[in-house]
Structures are given as C-alpha cells and as structure tokens.
C-alpha cells in the first residue's frame, strides 16, 4: 500500500484532504500537525513536526510515496498587509525544505497548492497565462505573492531532475 503524507493535516484544506483519502482506504495516510492538535481519525497516523526544521521535515517524508503539501504559516489577510514578513519568511523556509526533502527522499508524487495572490485585481476570471511576471503583484500582497511564485518555480526546478 502506498504511503501518502499530508503536511498541514489539521488545517482546513489538509483536514478535508486527509479525511477524503482516509475514507478511500487505498493509501496508508499520514498527516502532520504542529500547533493545532490532531483530530480523531483512526485511519490517519499523525506526526508532530515543526516544518521550519530541516531534520523534522526529512523525518516525516522518509519512506513516503506521495506528498500533499497543505502546510503553511497563515494568520489572515490583515497580517498579509500589516506584517507580510510572517508569511514570506516562514513559508519560504517550510516549502524550500519540503521540496528539497521530497526530492532527496525520491517521493514519486508531490502536490503543491498555490493560490491567486500573485494576480492583479480583475473583474474577469484569471488563468495561468494571464500572469505577467514582469509586473509586480498587487501592492499589499507583494511579499506573499513573490514567495508563492518562488515556491512554484522551486517545484518546477526539482521536477526537471530525473
């Protein structure tokens, strides 16, 4: 049975994804938590990990086949504007360690959730082809948007190694 790990398993997205795969019974499901206590689900093996610590990232990814990266430092849109460094620094560190460790541990699949923070405000739905990296993102989201783009490019970088 393939081993699937969901980082950020106690967050909104991570919990829903973990519960879905736990019901499927096709995978041995692992989930990380840090500040939020794990919820009750006997089909998920919970692992406490500080994902800003490289050694702990390596430990939870060892021996896994599939990674779903749903972990992040999040505090809300107010902090994105008033204290943007919180999201930029922690999430850049977390995702850099996660992507490197996934590569070094030879995980077969990595799923990384992105968002639309890097797009300019618009009255029409945006597509990936609408992103112009020559233009700065919306002023209030400058740091978080460029961090997200950096991590997307980090995923692409590691995907190029065979």
Locations of the language-model features?
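N-terminal Rossmann NAD(P)H-binding glycine-rich loop of SDR-like oxidoreductase domains
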Residues: 4-24
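Conserved glycine-rich Rossmann-like NAD(P)H-binding loop of the short-chain dehydrogenase/reductase
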Residues: 26-35
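Short loop/helix-cap segments at secondary-structure boundaries that form the rim of catalytic
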Residues: 36-43
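Rossmann-fold cofactor-recognition segment
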Residues: 43-53
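NAD(P)H-binding glycine-rich loop region in Rossmannoid oxidoreductase-like domains
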Residues: 51-90, 104
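Conserved Rossmann-fold NAD(P)-dependent oxidoreductase catalytic core, especially the SDR/UDP-sugar
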Residues: 69, 96-141
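Glycine-rich NAD(P)-binding loop of the Rossmann-fold in SDR/ketoreductase-type enzymes
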Residues: 82-97, 105, 142, 146-147
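Active-site Tyr-X1-5-Lys
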Residues: 139-162
């Amino acid at each position: 049975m393939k081993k699937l790990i969901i980082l950020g398993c106690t967050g909104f997205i991570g919990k829903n994804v973990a519960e879905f795969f736990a019901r499927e019974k096709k995978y041995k499901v692992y989930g990380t938590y840090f500040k939020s206590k794990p919820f009750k689900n006997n089909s998920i093996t919970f692992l406490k990990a500080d994902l800003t610590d490289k050694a702990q990232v390596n430990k939870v990814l060892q021996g896994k086949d599939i990674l779903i990266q749903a972990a992040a430092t999040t505090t809300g849109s107010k902090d994105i504007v008033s204290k943007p460094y919180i999201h930029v620094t922690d999430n850049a560190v977390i995702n850099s360690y996660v992507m490197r460790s996934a590569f070094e541990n030879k995980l077969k699949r990595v799923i990384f959730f992105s968002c639309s923070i890097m797009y300019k405000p618009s009255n029409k739905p945006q597509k990936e082809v609408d992103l112009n990296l020559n233009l700065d993102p919306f002023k209030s989201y400058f740091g978080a948007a460029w961090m997200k783009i950096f991590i997307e490019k980090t995923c692409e970088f590691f995907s190029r190694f065979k």
